[in-house]
Amino acid sequence: MHIRKTITILAALSAVAGCGTRKYCNTVKIDGDDGNTIIEKAADVVPTANQLAALDREFIAFIHFGPNTFTGKEWGSGFESSETFALETLDTDQWCKAIKDAGMKMVIFTAKHHDGYIMWQSRYTDHGIMSSKFRDGKGDVLKDLSESCRKYGLELGIYLSPADLYQIESPDGLYGNLSRPFLRTIPREVEGRPFSNKTKFKFNVDDYNEYYLNQLFELLTEYGPISEIWLDGAHPKTKGGQTYNYNAWRELIRTLAPKANIFGREDLRWCGNEGGHTRDSEWNVVPYMANPDTLTWYSDMMADPLGGREQLCEGKYLHYQPAETDVSVRDGWFWRDNTHQQTRTADNVFDMYERSVGGNAILLLNLPPDNQGRFPEKDLKTLEETGRRIRETYGIDLLEGAKCPKALLDNNIDTYIKVKDGEDFIVTLPEKRWINRIVLQEAIATVGERTERFAVDARIDGEWKEIATSTNIGHKRILRVNDIETDALRFRLLQSRAMVAISKISAHYSHWGPFYGNPFDIPELQDYDKNAWKTEGNSNVLVLGGQRRLGGIVYNPAAGKSESGIVSGVVSISDDGLSWTEVSSFEFGNLVNDPTPRYVHFHNPVGSRYLRIVSESLDPTLIGLF
């Protein structure tokens, strides 16, 4: 007969790193260990102070802003004129106030995207805002943003793309120019532009790495403090076998910004998609085949599951590495227009918040300003409503006044109760209350992520009923349950990697359902025979079988296989199949990482008997008409 054991601990317990026989660490070698030893070691892998700070931020903002804002492209080409960035007005206070009001803690800004265009007053190039007409070439978007962040109490992060199409395409470009590495001083002195920070570095690097390091120095010493450096792994194009001296980058970053996390490297990882999705079990203890603390290149982690027992045993090292879930509030990372470009609903963003933040990850929501330097009104409405829902749902803890171990309700992540497999604890409310959300947290900073399976019961009309089961907890697990009226909750630990340390439990009520419809308004698609495409070379012609009125096309890469990061083309119409009129052109960036439907809206609806798409890498059978 199974006898249930009940936790009776009433006082907070705290763990000390390295105490007893346990060894708590951020990275541990497991090569040659048996399965049981590996799981024991995994239970003691903990975040660094910087990683814990990143998890505690929970909800942060991304801002994509640059020449693409004015060209309507997702990825630039590197051939853009400096004057393409035709900004006349800028309101970073509006950005930061909206971000702060939504409950976000940090802003990450695209100081340089893949096009290589610089959004601050750099000493090391004239391809950037310094050559635009904005404020007579003296404008500095990053400086304005830095000041607004300080004003509104937000942390600042920078996105500095390692890829650089301008430095690839320019005749005098530094990327892949086959320059010889030699010992160079960082930062390189520029007459009339001295640095107040007198730190110097010596690195054996080539031209492009020197350029990148000089700009990192500018950003980290003149716009800080910087809390995150976002190193995107996307590369639209490469040249000359260019490599990155990440050891030098890391040394400079750790010296100048010791509290900054490096995304895309050992500190923070990509969740594996750009659609706001997390794994059902998003473990932050993950396997590596080599020591992640000394690697110079980090591959995207796409596996699902990623940190389960079987996956851990396949590695040679275990490492704590939180996931960021990046997604844009619009169908695209840059603003294109206020007419056709869709904006996510508050239902959708709130759902992603609960699944990502409540799934042991960080939600990074992109908010692209428009060509007037402001957030568009419909984006603001989504952001405002999302923030309101977060506050009204999670700002009130319905377990206040409950009877349970003190450590569970003291809001201190370092105090906790210990729970073994088969044990449980009970939280008794002062009276019956309606709830539909339950939040649990583990003491990951001092003990680690250990819960593998658990269940929660509610006492309803005097009887215990199971209302939820789940897998890992980690930093935070949000359980969304049906509306119930209860006077007690019971947590049951079903499986773990070691003694579990539960640091917090709370209950809440959301007036909004846990599920949502479509994130965007989707045009009604027209039916047509997809076998009617005729393909010759790069030209794909569709015989419409009569006069049809068309508003545009939609490409759905998720239904097929996309080998290319960029798909571009031209759409034309004809009444006889001989004489063609161009009605639109398109360029889809980043289809591999974000395989969501892409809409091409014609300037005006058109009537036609034939439709032609000229593109080198487009499967016409994945096209819809509207």
Question: Which residues does each PLM region occupy?
Answer:
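Positively charged n-region of N-terminal signal peptides that target proteins for export
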Residues: M1-K5
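Surface-exposed loop and turn segments in beta-propeller and other repeat-based domains
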Residues: F588-G589
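C-terminal motif of bacterial Sec signal peptides marking the signal peptidase cleavage site
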Residues: A17-G18
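Mature catalytic domains of secreted/periplasmic carbohydrate-active enzymes
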Residues: R22-R450, F454, A458, E466-V481, ...
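Aromatic, loop-rich ligand-recognition surfaces of beta-strand-rich domains
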Residues: R374, K378, T382, T393, ...
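Sec-dependent N-terminal signal peptides
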Residues: T6-S14
